């Protein structure tokens, strides 16, 4: 018996596990907000220590990336992400987790073809599309005369 796509979708909806959507959204919001709150606390601490605003922002990002890498290495970030969903994936910590996870997973294949190459299967598209988006945005601003040459 061949099943159509609509029949399959109906069967999945009927038999698949149902998650509490509002609770999942609220939890993702709280986790993402908590990560951002931690970032703001770190930034305020850097500013209170007399560090310039721009450098404080850079140090905050680096601190969150390092913390995410450590938590990923210990296996704790995956547990958080399993429950928090996009709340833990959208901030910069989610990107760091994705890169470090790939590096850990393919470590046995060697440093170059394992860790080095597989890290960028995740990071590569983000870097490419991020750079492309920045170039397009810069071109639009330049064409509008908002960006000095």
Provide a role label for each language-model segment:
Residues 1-9:
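Short, charged cytosolic
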Residues 9-24, 109-118:
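Cytosolic juxtamembrane amphipathic/interface segments immediately preceding
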Residues 25-30, 58-62:
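Hydrophobic alpha-helical transmembrane segments
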Residues 31-41, 64-72, 134-138:
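Hydrophobic core segments of alpha-helical transmembrane domains in multi-pass membrane transport
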Residues 49-68:
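Loop-to-helix transition at the N-terminal end of transmembrane alpha-helices
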Residues 76-111:
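Mid-chain, well-packed structural core segment of small domains
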Residues 116-132:
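Individual transmembrane alpha-helices with interfacial aromatic-anchor signatures
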Residues 136-149:
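Juxtamembrane boundary at the C-terminal end of a transmembrane helix
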